[in-house]
Amino acid sequence: MQSFLQSSELIISYFQSSLPAYLVLVFVFSLCVGSFLNVVIYRLPKMMERSWQQEYQQYFQPDQTVVESEPFNLAVPRSRCPHCQHQLTAADNIPLLSYLSLGGKCRYCRAPISRRYPLVELATALLSVVVAWQTGATSLGLLYLLVTWALVALSAIDIDTMLLPDQINLPLLWLALLA
């Protein structure tokens, strides 16, 4: 445990002394976060709608049997092409690079991929670099990055559905109250 703490302290001190290396790390990591945010942006409103439908059925139609559906959350099912429903490989999910290498089209059916996916990834990465540049490798910087990522997800969900999910809003509220 002691060696782990020493190693992590060395890594943190390196990034505190080398801003360019820290910004590159934040950019690459934030591209991955942006890819995950695309999943959140697409699936969280659908999960909320399913939950509302189940609650409605339980309250207004309690005598009807509940039909079990396939699991649908942020982890399952795996990502698929919205056109041909082919399950995407890990290589197809590499943030921004896979979009560019595939020319913005599905590898399997060649249907165009929405530009929103790379835009969310790139916006997340660029906003994160600005935050990291302003705050440096600090705990406050990490907090600001988390808030930035949450705001990216909330913005896109709001644009798509005019909803602001409590699953994202309430943690931000508590974070603001405790900070």
Region spans (language model):
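A membrane-topology feature that recognizes alpha-helical transmembrane segments
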Residues: 1-179
